[in-house]
Amino acid sequence: MEKGEDPGSLIKVIHLLVLSGAWGMQVWVTFISGFLLFRSLPRHTFGLVQSKVFPVYFHVSLGCAFINLCILAPQRAWIHLTLWEVSQLSLLLLSLTLATINARWLEARTTAVMRALQSIEKERGLGTEVPGNFQGPDPYRQLRDKDPKYSALRRKFYHYHGLSSLCNLGCLLSNGLCLVGLALGLRSL
């Protein structure tokens, strides 16, 4: 498109719906559903639910980032991009990259380690309790202290989980900043 040419109302609406939908989904999954499920479900049931939800969530995030990048990238000749447009494209590329890392690499590894942990826990009769409902000493801490394999798997799980959480927060922040930019560019409400 030439400099200043309007991309059309439909493209603008699609861009806004995909971006805001992705951001809303990310807020819900990151800050609401995970905490509610963690506090309400038995530990292994929570893990099973998350292992089903996260692949879909990460792939939808990836798809939304890809769609938004495809909508925005061809709108202007690259030489005519403003600082904000370059920033927005960079944020969407970051979101796409982080969502891809989560969807294609981290999720599978995190789930595999979680299943290995759950297997050991099941052998010890653990995993059916809702987190936070312990009476007496923490049986998971005792298991960590006694079983070096379990302890190593747990560290590996938290390593992958931590990286995945950082990628997810990066996507959330990137999309949020893009939405802020769009909101600041509104001429009226």
From Swiss-Prot:
Keywords: Membrane, Transmembrane, Transmembrane helix. It is found in: Membrane. It is a multi-pass membrane protein. The chain crosses the membrane at residues 18-38, 53-73, 81-101, 166-186. Disulfide bonds: none annotated. GO terms for cellular component: membrane. Its main location: membrane. Pfam families: DUF4149. It comes from the Eukaryota. Belongs to the TMEM205 family. This is Transmembrane protein 205. It comes from Mus musculus. The gene is Tmem205.
